[in-house]
Amino acid sequence: AKRLPVTMAEFSRGCVFKCDFCASKITLALGYRKKSPERCAEEVKHMHDLGFKEFMLADDIFTSDNKWAKNVCDEITKTNIDMPWSCSNGIRVESADEDLFKSLRKSGCYRVSFGFESGNDEVLKLFGKGGRATVDQAKTAVQTARAAGIDTNGYFMLGLSPDTEKSMNDTIDFARSIPLDMM
């Protein structure tokens, strides 16, 4: 955290994906719902008015809809509130683009977290990522976020059913090779 006190925010709930390892498809089985960008900005203003100096966004997949995510960032920017925030979850590597990260940064976002899961494309497919996310996309996402001035965090998993010794070593090598600020 950059400033205390910090609070949590949630602009969307649920997930449109059904990754094998994730509990969201069961615990949040009502599907994917998101608030309007205006409502999100109102909540940020309310948190600020309550005395919070920073928030952590807890959405499972903030960037499943880049247009919506950019609109949320634009609405937060319009409030002119100096309130840094981080996205502790929910940045999809396949959705990462320069415009998105510029919007995130402009709105006060200073850190994003990526669920890389594995450094092996075959394991990513077997995990239920469906070929949507690849190791190359993950590398590009980190570079693009960092170029926009955003710190990066990565989540990895080892030892799930499709993993082999080779795929786990691929994941370890991948984690060592990318310039993350946290993992």
Predicted regions located by residue number:
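Radical SAM [4Fe-4S] cluster-binding motif and immediate context
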Residues: 1-155, 173
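Catalytic cores of alpha/beta
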Residues: 100, 161-177
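Short glycine/proline-centered loop/turn elements that form peptide/ligand docking sites
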Residues: 158
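Gly/Pro- and small hydrophobic-enriched strand-loop and loop-to-helix capping segments
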Residues: 183
